[in-house]
Amino acid sequence: MASESKFAVLKEKERETRKQIVIESTLTLFSKKPFYEVGMRDVAEEAGVSPATLYRYFPSQEALFIESFLQDISSVAKEFESMIKKDEPASIEEFAVKFTNHLLDNESSFQMMTYLMLKDDLTNPAIGRFDSLTKVFFDLFSQLMERHGVVREDARLFSHSFIASITGIIMTFRNYSMRSREKVKSHINQLVRITASLYTKELLGE
């Protein structure tokens, strides 16, 4: 009986290892081209498996992409956590600029986020995973505000407003008609800094 239990544990570990290979293959493709150009056959080829094998681990392409995006965001979240936990926590502007530049510099992450925001027929499991994604940044900004002395109830409400404001700026001006991508990025960051200064004045009185 004990040997059967060990075998089951081993099989589960092997399954999780293979699942992780699929996720890493997906993220590799996301770094090369927009997520909407990535299909299950592309992922299968990158991972060295058949397309049918992918569905043993993920019920749909949507589920795979969300899981990959969540893992990517979770990795980035560690950098934000270090900014928050410093002896002198990051300013609202520093947080905003880092959040903005991450989305601008990681095209597939941004596209996946906006896709999930706008899609109106997400399945229940996908909705739950997307809630987890958005909660990551809501929680991070709330923690930052609490480090700056804002009470928890206010911090939570303002975190929703702040993250929505920043993503709205990026969505509005990402394809703005300027001569270069760098000028667009500079303009977006200027607007983000203005927004951050308003929140700083309102919440921190600075």
PLM feature spans:
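Hydrophobic alpha-helical connector segments
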Residues: 67, 81-107, 158-162
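Amphipathic alpha-helical packing segments from all-alpha helical-bundle domains
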Residues: 74-82, 123-149, 156-160, 186-189, ...
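Amphipathic alpha-helical segments used for helix-helix packing
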Residues: 104-124, 171-178
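Hydrophobic/aromatic-rich alpha-helical bundle segments in the mid-to-C-terminal region
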Residues: 115, 146-193, 203-206
